[in-house]
């Protein structure tokens, strides 16, 4: 099947094109709504690139240029020849708990729950509507970041607030990075030559946004992110878990509005708030130069991660493997080492030489004596979206 995967942002469209699950092209429409917009399409098979620089006023114009570049490159004759298009959607809310084909109800529901993800869902919706207009005969599939976590039990996803907040306003823990956690847990099963239903995995997706997921027999039973992606780990610019009583205190102390506090927690906190950097390469360079705030930021990040992984050892009946993924999880050997050393009493023994090797691809980095496998698996959310899109179109 020919599947296009779209990740639509407020001023951008990222895309990948798969033919029978093999990536053929990838690209980006950036600076939508600006005069210096750019469209880039790369033929993955021969590294040939096709670019246009022009004014792109909206998503519809951007996708039209993408279609032109597909034709020019010879990769795809027309968007209408696709078998399907998979759309990454951050938040499905309470009612859209599973990936699904797009229809009028789905469009209305994605719009309705935009209040939960105001920076993401409206842009995703624009991407879907643009695709429907550009290629009306092509099936569109909505792939929700929240869907993988639909298997969490109620005692894991509920907040201890008055029940009406859940019943009437759908306030609960939803979890995110679901497509990534689903992908790497499946790959872990393949690497360990086991069926997903036989395996318990703790997946750590570590990027500028970061989350941990406890996966029992292929199903999410708990995850660190909650109602929004702000809960949980210390992240690049997000604070993660916080005593909620701090918020009214800060408001009175600094005279900040709710919106300003939201910006503070999401964009000015995390390791950036501690040391002024959110790129871990910069943080580790600063540590080498004696920057104690950088050292503190790294220690806080790793300590919170250790606490969550340790908690999920308690949640799962048995832990077979820990998976590191995301930009930091895949590339930062120091973070992996600091985390695994603190978890040694749980049967985790890292092979330090394997951990330090700067190689790409899936690999096992635990010592042969380790009771728990430690894996590094590069995530591929677009491939997972393409796979699910094919599966749902095939069923219908």
Swiss-Prot record:
The cross-references to CDD domains, in alphabetical order and at most eight, read: ASKHA_NBD_AcK_PK
Binding-site list for Mg(2+): 7, 381
Q: Which UniProt keywords apply?
A: ATP-binding, Cytoplasm, Kinase, Magnesium, Metal-binding, Nucleotide-binding, Transferase
**Any one cellular component term from GO for this entry?**
cytoplasm
One term of GO molecular function: ATP binding
Q: In which pathway does it act?
A: Metabolic intermediate biosynthesis; acetyl-CoA biosynthesis; acetyl-CoA from acetate: step 1/2
Residues binding ATP, per UniProt: 14, 205-209, 279-281, 327-331
Q: Does the keyword Protein biosynthesis apply?
A: no
Q: Which family does the record assign? A: Belongs to the acetokinase family.
- This one is known as Acetate kinase
State the species of origin. Campylobacter jejuni subsp. doylei (strain ATCC BAA-1458 / RM4099 / 269.97)
């Amino acid at each position: 099947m020919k599947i296009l995967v779209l990740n639509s942002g407020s001023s951008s469209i990222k895309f990948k094109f798969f033919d029978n699950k093999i990536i053929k092209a990838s690209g980006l429409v950036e600076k939508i709504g600006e005069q210096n917009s750019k469209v880039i399409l790369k033929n993955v098979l021969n590294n040939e690139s096709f670019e246009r620089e022009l004014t792109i006023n909206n998503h519809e114009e951007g996708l039209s240029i993408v279609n032109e570049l597909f034709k020019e490159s010879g990769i795809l004759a027309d968007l209408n020849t696709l078998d399907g298009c998979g759309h990454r959607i951050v938040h499905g809310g309470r009612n859209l708990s599973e990936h699904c084909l797009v229809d009028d109800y789905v469009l209305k529901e994605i719009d309705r729950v935009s209040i939960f993800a105001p920076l993401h869902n409206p842009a995703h919706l624009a991407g879907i509507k643009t695709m429907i207009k550009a290629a009306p005969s092509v099936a569109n599939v909505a792939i929700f970041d929240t869907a993988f976590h639909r298997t969490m039990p109620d005692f894991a996803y509920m907040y201890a607030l008055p029940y009406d907040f859940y019943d009437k306003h759908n306030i609960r823990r939803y979890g995110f990075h679901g497509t990534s956690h689903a992908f790497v847990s499946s790959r872990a099963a393949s690497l360990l030559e086991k069926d997903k239903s036989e395996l318990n995995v703790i997946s750590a997706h570590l990027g500028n946004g970061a989350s941990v997921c406890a996966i029992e027999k292929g199903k999410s039973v708990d995850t660190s992110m909650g109602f929004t992606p702000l809960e949980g780990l210390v992240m690049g610019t997000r604070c993660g878990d916080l005593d909620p009583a701090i918020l009214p205190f800060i408001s009175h102390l600094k005279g900040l509005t709710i919106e300003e506090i939201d910006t503070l927690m999401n964009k000015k906190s995390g390791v950036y708030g501690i040391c002024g950097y959110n790129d871990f390469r910069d943080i580790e360079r600063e540590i080498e130069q004696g920057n104690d705030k950088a050292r503190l930021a790294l220690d806080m990040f790793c300590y919170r991660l250790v606490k969550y992984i340790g908690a999920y050892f308690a949640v799962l009946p048995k832990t077979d493997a820990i998976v590191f993924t995301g930009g930091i999880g895949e590339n930062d050997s120091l973070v992996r080492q600091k985390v695994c050393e603190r978890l040694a009493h749980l049967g985790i023994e890292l092979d330090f030489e394997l951990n330090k090797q700067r190689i790409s691809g899936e690999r096992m980095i635990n010592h042969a004596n380790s009771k728990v496998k430690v894996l590094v698996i590069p995530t591929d959310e677009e491939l997972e979206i393409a796979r699910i899109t094919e599966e749902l179109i095939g069923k219908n």
